[in-house]
Each structure stands twice: as C-alpha cells, then as structure tokens.
Amino acid sequence: MNIDNMDLEMTTASDFAEKKESVDVKRENPSFTNSIKALPIQSELSAMMSKDNTLNHVKQEPSDGFSSVKWASTSFDSTVTAHKEETPYSSSLGSHDSSSLPSSTNNRYSSVLKELCNTYLPSILSTYGSLPIRRLLHHLSLMLPSFNELTPTQQRRLLTRALESKKGIQFEKIGWGRWVLRDSTIPANSHPQSLPSNSIPKTEPLDTPSLSNSQERFSKSPSDGQNVRSRAKKIPSGMSAEESDELLSSSGRKTRSFNTPFSSFFASLEETPGSYTAHLGGVLSPREQTPALFTGQYPDNGVYYEEEEEEEDDNDLFDEHEYGYGTLPPFVFDEDQMLDGGESTDEEDWRAIGTEALLRKVNTKKRRPSRVLVHRDQVAVEAMLMLSGSV
C-alpha cells in the first residue's frame, strides 16, 4: 500500500514539474510576443513601400518597430514636399491657384497676358474710353476665344494683373473703379486727374486756338456742309475773359472753351444755339426740328419748361390786381389771429381782409398754383363777398 502511494506521488510530482517547465518556457520567451505585436506594423510598412518606391531602402528592425515607422513617415513627407517643389506654378494668377491649374498651361497664360497688355486692352480702352472691369471682361470674352476657357475668378485675376502691369503700355485707375489708357511716356505724377486744381499749368496745346489772342476761328457752314475759316474780331490784350465773351456774343458768334483733349476736332464743328447736343456737332433737338408743334419760349439750353410759362401768367395776374388796388396797404397774414382771435364772424373777416389780401394768401404757398386755379379762387372769393354784402 505504501509502494503504491509512493508511485502515485512520484507520478504527480513529475506531471507537475512538466507543467511548470512548459509554463516557464512560455513566460520566459518574449520574442514570440514581440513578433506578434510587430505583425501589423510590418504590414503597414509593406503597404507604404508598395505605394511609393522611395521607401524601398527603409531598414526594418524587428526589435524596434515603432522607430522604423516614425522614420518611414518622415521620409514619405519629405518626398511629397520635394515632389511639390519640383513643379512650381509661376503663372501670373498667383501661387494659391497652383492646385487648380496645371503647370503645363503656364506658357498659355503668359501668352494671353501679353495679348491683353499689348493688343486687346489698348484697343478696347481707346475705342470705348474708361470702362470698369466687368465691361472689360465682357469685351474680352467676345474678342478673345482663349479667354473664355478660364473660370470667372481666373479671368478677373488675369485682367487685374494685366491692368496693373508696369511694363510697356500702362493703364491707370480713375474714380469708381474705372480704368483708362495712359501713355507710357507720361509719368504717373503728371496725369491731369492726379493733380490738384490750383497746380494745373495754364498752358494751351499748340493746335488749340486761344480765346485771347486768336486771329481765326473755325465754323461750319450749314449750306455747303464744309468747314471754312471765318475771321474773328481782334480782342484787346487788357480785356478780361468775360468782356471778350460779351464782345463775341454781341457780334453774333457763340463762344466755347477748348479744355477737352479733342478740342482740335470739335473746333471745326458749329455750335448750334439752343441745342443740347451742340458738343457733338450741332445736332438739333426734336423741339427745334419741329417748332410748330410746341409753344412757349426756349431757354438757351433748348429745354422747354411749361412751369415757367405758368409762373409768368401768374405774375401778370398779380400785377394787374396790384395796379387796380395800388392804394391798399400790404397785408400780413396771421393764421392764429384769423382762426382764433376776435368775436367777429367769417363774413366780417372777409370784409376786413378784402379781395387783394385773399389773393395774396394764395401767393404765400411755396408752390404757385396754375392760372386756372387762381382764377377759380378769385371767382369764389368775389361770390362770397357778394353773398355777404347781400345779407
């Protein structure tokens, strides 16, 4: 019995020792655990190496997987940065558009920019004068087919770049965002619009006739339609500009100032009296072409005002009453006294005021009534006076 117990104890002890050795072996072997942990890291490295050939030289260290991943990500970022620096965008639209525009179109944009500065913009501005950017974009989209291939933002930036260019033909921005063509030979500080009014030199162009010392004036003959020279009266040197204007106007000639850059062109055109388009060559207005359809007097600017005729009629009406009642003293209208003061009735107030005062009450308004209204009020006042007198 004791022998059997001893064998059982030995078997149990041997089994326990084997189990203990197997457990110790599993605990004391950390390489297996590290290899399991390094499996996903190695798979990530292999995926990155397959995407970019520049990671083939990465050295993987199985003992320190995290340091290899950090070194690989750093090399990948530097490679991407170097790739971006190899293809810069040097177009005139700015560096912020390098992602939206390929580098192969740089030459095309530079050629479009040259065409804008040298050909299209000078032609448009010399034809239409000062224009805003939106109008320039419209004209360029019609004239330049390659300009329509750009987006609206790129078109605006390219046009702004061309307008602000300091080489070759130069342009200048004036009030309210409008651009004009400026001669490249004239410096920027000598432009007439950039100088104050008191600093503008009082010099006249050589081809522009002067008002004080001119011997001949240009006029246009309506009969033959050709420009002929007509002699003007000699003006004394000591005479002022206003006196010279009066002298020329008294002789039946219209005067004008030659302050525009196209004065030499308009000097050969006749200034028709009473025409609102005299500066365009004396084109007659509709009222001047058919004067029989219109009544009344025309002012110097050729515009007909009906209110002026009504005011003249009203003044004539008041003048007639003033002549008829010239002995009456001037009446001062007091609204408070007329409405609240005194115990007399309205009829007695009308008698005290009189017809002249009632008519003057109408004249106290800011806007004068028409002739018909004044006549109607006059008849009403006279009727009330007659009724009050009969009572």
UniProtKB/Swiss-Prot annotation:
Family annotation (InterPro entries): Stb3
Subcellular compartments: Cytoplasm
Record's keyword terms, sorted: Cytoplasm, Phosphoprotein
Biological process annotations from GO: positive regulation of transcription by RNA polymerase II
Region (Disordered): 1-29, 85-105, 189-253
Biased composition (Low complexity): 90-105
GO terms for MF: DNA-binding transcription activator activity, RNA polymerase II-specific; sequence-specific DNA binding; transcription cis-regulatory region binding
Composition bias, Polar residues: 189-201, 209-229
Organism domain of life: Eukaryota
Record's GO cellular component terms: cytosol; nucleus
Post-translational modification Phosphoserine, affected residues: 194, 199
The keyword RNA-binding is annotated on this UniProt entry: no
Family according to the record: Belongs to the STB3 family.
Protein name (record): Protein STB3 homolog
Organism whose genome encodes this protein: Schizosaccharomyces pombe (strain 972 / ATCC 24843)
